[in-house]
Amino acid sequence: MAWLDQSARSLFLAEFVSSFLLAMRYFFKPKVTLNYPFEKGPLSPRFRGEHALRRYPNGEERCIACKLCEAICPALAITIEAGPRRNDGTRRTTRYDIDMTKCIYCGLCQEACPVDAIVEGPNFEFATETREELMYDKNRLLANGDRWEREIAKNIALDAPYR
């Protein structure tokens, strides 16, 4: 019985020493914690944040009202109404709404879009005080696209080889 007691004590001491050495090793390494509101970490080019509608360089909106994003959305968060055909035969949306309270940020709308009109941008700080502020209309989505166009274009270019 004495040998069992002795081996238990030595095992405890060995475990204690190894755990102490592990703690000391990480104690002297550089810290990886970020002070979030003041420091921001890197985002992946594939990060899916706040939605945005993009424009062509001439200022015309990209969305052609094909409604593929509305059809593929598993949460049924997108509502689109298409206007009449224009003289050149193309269509544009008269209504493009996203209910962000339903959105699950899966990115299927972005993948389904044939003209890269709807994208999920790099912004993740869009907290609101009311639910009504999370109902995005076409004007807000276009404003998001205008605000984040440089970052969105860079992320799409980085992701292009994998699409």
Swiss-Prot record:
Organism expressing this protein natively: Parvibaculum lavamentivorans (strain DS-1 / DSM 13023 / NCIMB 13966)
Occurrences of domain 4Fe-4S ferredoxin-type (ranges): 53-83, 94-123
Entry protein name: NADH-quinone oxidoreductase subunit I
Keywords per UniProt: 4Fe-4S, Cell inner membrane, Cell membrane, Iron, Iron-sulfur, Membrane, Metal-binding, NAD, Quinone, Repeat, Translocase, Ubiquinone
The gene coding this protein: nuoI
InterPro entries: 4Fe4S_Fe-S-bd, 4Fe4S_Fe_S_CS, NADH_quinone_OxRdtase_chainI
UniProt KW Membrane keyword: yes
EC supergroup of this enzyme: translocase
GO molecular function, one term: quinone binding
Gene3D superfamilies: 3.30.70.3270
